[in-house]
């Protein structure tokens, strides 16, 4: 009888543990939150909207698996004055990277790749690479030296491979990439992903592998590796292995037409710092790219999603790779992803894991986030983080860049942490 009671006790505890792994959307008051202090977020955001420093924002806060805040502010479209709904869809740009990184780690757990395996094992064009030595800006000619070693999958995940971006990197690499027709990875391209990545493999690296951090097309290349190894498109692989198991119903490379009316309008600023709608002439990015049928699936910047969908993804990682009973990764793999992988602070203060910025000891003393918090964001003004110590996931979503009042997310972050009772 005692054994039977013990078994039932274990069963109940395990059942509760599994059920507690999803985000509880019930309207409950969290004892961990000082709601009077949290309300300063409303005051702050409304001030930014009133001064026309922002047009529309969505915030979401999940604490102890409980939905604490999920709000839309301002407008989905400022011209039509359509209110911003909490389930608005955002071009999340570089927030795509973490999802692609998890895709790679799924293949890693299946034994289909090693983190320190050469990229050239899968794409021959990345064998025998060279590194840029001297560059002549007058005619874009250059000299090279041999790479000391081949680039690896770990190098791609940590942006330490020497691969650059085609439109935001160094002047030399931008010129070399432009001459070769390498895409930026942002927006829409009527091209083949594998073809473009093979072209990239024939070009020089910007520095010796592992020596520096340089944001670049690394995650587009990881997406290409997923397609080669899995024999699926990146879209199909992520949908089958991440989106559908987690119930991420609003995350797409190609947004379905019936959901297009939930897309937030993208804004930029004119020379007087007044907000204006984004035009496709800016950086050659058509703002309608989420609805444009594409087959170049950018693992670095191609997804559109909602704050709640992305919160589910982050909660899965915070739970150690499981959400609502669906295991995506093992706890140890998540631990590896969210542990420092570089011998240097990539931005002077923070560590960098396999796809995430990680708050270091040094950074934890400079701001509210606890050591070990992992985060990143997207070009159009979206940002996210998960704080394991606080058991919290937060997202702040806008569609506005460049932004002369880009300190809003930092101020919201300060308010969130000041509202924590424990």
Mark where each language-model region is.
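Active-site SXXK
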Residues: 42-45, 65, 90-123, 127, ...
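Short, conserved catalytic-motif segment at the N-terminal edge
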Residues: 29-92, 112-114, 131-136, 288, ...
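Short loop/turn microsegments at loop-to-beta-strand junctions
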Residues: 55-57, 68, 380-383, 392
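Short, surface-exposed loop or secondary-structure junction motifs
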Residues: 127-371
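Short, contiguous pre-domain boundary segments
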Residues: 21-30, 180-184
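Bacterial Sec-dependent N-terminal signal peptides
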Residues: 1-24
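Short, well-ordered beta-strand elements
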Residues: 384, 391-400
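Extracellular/periplasmic catalytic domains that process cell-envelope and extracellular macromolecules
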Residues: 53, 83-84, 114, 144-151, ...
């Amino acid at each position: 009888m005692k054994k039977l009671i013990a078994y039932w006790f274990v069963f109940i505890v395990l059942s509760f543990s599994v059920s507690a792994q999803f985000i509880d959307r019930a309207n409950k008051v969290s004892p961990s939150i000082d709601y009077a202090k949290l309300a300063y977020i409303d005051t702050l955001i409304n001030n930014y909207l009133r001064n026309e420093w922002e047009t529309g924002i969505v915030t979401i806060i999940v604490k102890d698996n409980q939905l604490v805040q999920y709000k839309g502010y301002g407008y989905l479209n400022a011209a039509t004055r359509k209110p911003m709904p909490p389930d608005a869809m955002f071009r999340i740009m570089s927030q795509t990277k973490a999802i692609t990184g998890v895709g790679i780690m799924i293949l890693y757990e299946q034994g289909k790749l090693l983190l320190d395996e050469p990229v050239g094992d899968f794409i021959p064009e990345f064998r025998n690479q060279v590194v840029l030595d001297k560059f002549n800006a007058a005619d874009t000619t250059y000299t090279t030296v041999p790479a000391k070693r081949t680039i690896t999958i770990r190098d791609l995940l940590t942006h330490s491979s020497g691969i650059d971006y085609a439109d935001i990197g160094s002047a030399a690499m931008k010129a070399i990439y432009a001459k070769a027709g390498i895409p930026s990875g942002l927006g829409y391209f009527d091209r083949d992903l594998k073809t473009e990545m093979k072209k990239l493999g024939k070009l020089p690296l910007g520095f010796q592998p592992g020596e520096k951090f340089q944001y670049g097309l690394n995650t587009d290349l990881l997406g290409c590796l997923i397609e080669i190894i899995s024999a699926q498109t990146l879209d199909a692989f992520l949908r089958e292995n991440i989106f559908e198991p987690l119930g991420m119903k609003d995350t797409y490379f190609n947004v379905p037409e019936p959901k297009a009316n939930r897309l937030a309008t993208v804004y930029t600023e004119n020379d007087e710092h007044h907000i204006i709608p984004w035009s496709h002439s800016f950086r050659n990015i058509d703002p309608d790219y989420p609805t444009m049928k594409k087959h170049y699936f950018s693992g670095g910047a191609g997804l559109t999603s909602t704050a709640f969908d992305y919160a589910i993804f982050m909660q899965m990682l915070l739970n150690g790779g499981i959400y609502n009973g669906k295991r995506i990764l093992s706890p140890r793999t998540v631990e590896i992803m969210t542990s420092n992988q570089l011998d240097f602070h990539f931005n002077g203060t923070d560590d960098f894991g396999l796809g995430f910025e990680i708050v270091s000891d040094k950074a934890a003393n400079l701001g509210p986030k606890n050591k070990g918090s992992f985060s990143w964001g997207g070009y159009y003004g979206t940002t996210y983080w998960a704080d394991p110590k606080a058991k919290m996931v937060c997202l702040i979503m806008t569609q506005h860049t460049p932004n002369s009042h880009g300190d809003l997310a930092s101020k919201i972050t300060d308010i969130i942490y000041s509202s924590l009772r424990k």
